[in-house]
């Protein structure tokens, strides 16, 4: 499903914390409006279409923070927003803390959440194809795939290489701090993601001093490569929403530090490539257990990445990436406790079992 991107918001630079070099004075093309007492409004998504703990802390994005019992806050362009769910409330609520326009913030939020895609319809389709998926979905409703800004998603997953979630989050927080400060919530600072121009003024050495290690050269190399693209790097990334998955992945893999797995993550979480399947050793193990038993015991090679992705697409169709996202979430420790209460065991299920366990583990736990 390919959709046009809403009109882009202006890039805004900001003050940078030492030891990074100071940016130029930011120029705001639109006035930011900050609210006083938070006002909450119902979002056009029920809890069965969006469950916050099954969407945000699951490895899709590392820029959203838990700021309440069931509340998450983050930025989308120049908009600082919060989402919350309360026991007994069917609808998810949202609050705009800072924005160029409250109406624009709502539209940007719905776009970010892929709100036009019905989980109920997808889950019904997947369950018909795989009854075991239906059992998982019954317990893990509301796990959505996000539609992030491609540059933001790309930089985040460059930080994810051979890394753990805590360290990735620290790196992403550092990159985010290069953008305009939009506000503080529950002790967390929130910034608009920095522009390509702002990122280009940070050297590899400065990223290394900030603890990025070898990833520093990938970030600076990718930023330079994007800036050299005819028409601009942001436009080039957005153009990958309009091409076939193979072409998008191949294009992303020309960037420093981007391999097939990272490219698939970026494609799935920001480029409308809903059939993208990030493949690593964890996904390989699950695939050989349940989808490709003839390859059990074989070593994962670049050539076999395609076979794994094809197996998921063959099973679940053009939105296979959404199915794999839920199956990955089922692997998270917080969810395993719930799933172990099922009448059917989770591990080593045969073809007649009603519950399946599959992983889209793009990160080290």
UniProtKB/Swiss-Prot annotation:
Keywords: DNA damage, DNA repair, DNA-binding, Glycosidase, Hydrolase, Lyase, Multifunctional enzyme, Nucleus
Tissue localization of expression: Expressed in stems, roots, rosette and cauline leaves, flowers and seeds.
Binding residues annotated for 8-oxoguanine, in chain numbering: 278, 280, 324, 328
UniProt-annotated binding residues for DNA: 162, 167, 215, 282
Gene deletion effect: No visible phenotype under normal growth conditions or UV-A irradiation stress.
GO molecular function: class I DNA-(apurinic or apyrimidinic site) endonuclease activity; damaged DNA binding; oxidized purine nucleobase lesion DNA N-glycosylase activity
GO biological process: base-excision repair; DNA repair; nucleotide-excision repair
UniProt-listed Enzyme Commission number(s): 3.2.2.-, 4.2.99.18
Major localization listed first in the record, in broad terms: nucleus
Gene3D superfamilies per record: 3.30.310.40, Helix-hairpin-Helix base-excision DNA repair enzymes (C-terminal), Hypothetical protein, domain 2
Cell compartment(s), UniProt: Nucleus
Region (Disordered) location: 1-24
Disulphide bridges: none
Catalytic activity: 2'-deoxyribonucleotide-(2'-deoxyribose 5'-phosphate)-2'-deoxyribonucleotide-DNA = a 3'-end 2'-deoxyribonucleotide-(2,3-dehydro-2,3-deoxyribose 5'-phosphate)-DNA + a 5'-end 5'-phospho-2'-deoxyribonucleoside-DNA + H(+)
Catalytic machinery residues: 261 (schiff-base intermediate with dna)
CDD domains hit by this protein: ENDO3c
Pfam families listed in its UniProt record: HhH-GPD, OGG_N
A cellular component annotation (GO) from this entry: nucleus
Domain of life: Eukaryota
Coiled-coil ranges (or none): none
General function of this protein: Involved in repair of DNA damaged by oxidation by incising DNA at 8-oxoG residues. Excises 7,8-dihydro-8-oxoguanine and 2,6-diamino-4-hydroxy-5-N-methylformamidopyrimidine (Fapy) from damaged DNA. Has a beta-lyase activity that nicks DNA 3' to the lesion.
Note in the entry: Transgenic seeds over-expressing OGG1 exhibit enhanced seed longevity associated with reduced DNA damage, enhanced seed tolerance to abiotic stresses and improved germination performance under abiotic stresses.
Family: Belongs to the type-1 OGG1 family.
Protein's name according to its UniProt entry: N-glycosylase/DNA lyase OGG1
Lineage: Eukaryota, Viridiplantae, Streptophyta, Embryophyta, Tracheophyta
